[in-house]
Structure formats: structure tokens, C-alpha cells
């Protein structure tokens, strides 16, 4: 990054994208990027392949989660942040991941993300349902999705 470049609010995501190019920004960091919920994580949440080598990062607080198969590859969007291409899960996939990891981040966070995603029209019901099936949380999310309509 050039010395005179402006640092954005997503600087840590750009730094993570540069140091872990095969990783995908997920969960709380993806929620913050998409403007969903009130969570403001102090570390960057990154999804990596199940058998990938764990990156060693200095000067960057990061939490790694291991995803495999279609759960890793589905719903990836590429965004340009500070000149770096950063891979971030889309809103529907991020919400489904929040339900998948509800014991780690809290059910209240997942519900808030779902509510905000629906109210801000970041994803359709079909996109949310497809992501729920891929993340294998369709039965968990069904009552909450039904309550939205």
C-alpha cells in the first residue's frame, strides 16, 4: 500500500486478503463488511480449506475456521479493498454460517444478522434457503425464515 493512500475502515480485511489469498472473510467480519448487525469484531474471521496449512500472521488478529467442499466455495464474492482483491462470503451465506456456528458466536447474533439481511434486502428468501441447505442448517433456520414472511 502506498504511503499516501487512505486507510479505510476495512483495512484489516485488505491486510488479511493480502496475507491469506486463499482464505475467505466470514462470519462476524463478513457481517461487519456487509453492514449487518451490530457486531464489531476485534479480529478478522477467515475461512480456510480443511487441509490447508494454518497461516502464521504477525501484526494481525485473525481467527481461522476450517470449511470443506461446497461449504467453502459457495457464495464467495470478490471485492476490491484498498487495491487488494478480498474474497468475502455474500450476505446469504454469511447468515447461514452464523446459524451453523451459533454455539460459537451466539444465536442472538445469527438472529440479528438474519433480521438485518431481510430488512435491508441484501438477500432474497431463495438465496437464504439455498445457503441454509448448503451449510446444512435448513432445519435450524426454517422457523426463523418462516417468521419473516
Regions found by a protein language model. Name each.
Residues 1-149:
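Nucleic-acid-binding surface
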Amino acid at each position: 500500500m502506498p504511503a499516501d493512500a487512505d486507510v479505510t475502515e476495512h483495512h484489516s480485511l485488505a491486510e488479511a486478503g493480502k496475507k491469506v489469498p486463499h482464505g475467505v472473510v466470514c462470519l462476524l467480519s463478513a457481517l461487519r463488511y456487509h453492514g449487518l448487525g451490530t457486531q464489531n469484531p476485534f479480529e478478522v474471521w477467515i475461512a480456510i480449506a480443511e487441509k490447508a496449512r494454518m497461516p502464521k500472521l504477525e501484526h494481525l488478529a485473525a481467527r481461522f475456521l476450517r470449511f470443506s467442499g461446497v461449504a467453502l466455495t459457495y457464495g464467495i464474492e470478490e471485492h476490491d479493498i484498498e487495491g487488494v482483491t478480498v474474497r468475502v462470503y455474500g450476505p446469504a451465506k454469511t447468515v447461514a454460517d452464523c446459524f451453523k456456528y451459533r454455539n460459537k458466536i451466539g444465536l442472538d447474533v445469527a438472529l440479528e444478522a438474519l433480521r438485518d439481511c431481510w430488512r435491508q434486502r441484501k438477500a432474497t428468501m431463495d438465496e437464504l434457503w439455498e445457503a441454509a441447505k448448503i451449510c446444512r442448517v435448513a432445519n435450524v433456520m426454517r422457523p426463523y425464515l418462516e417468521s419473516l414472511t
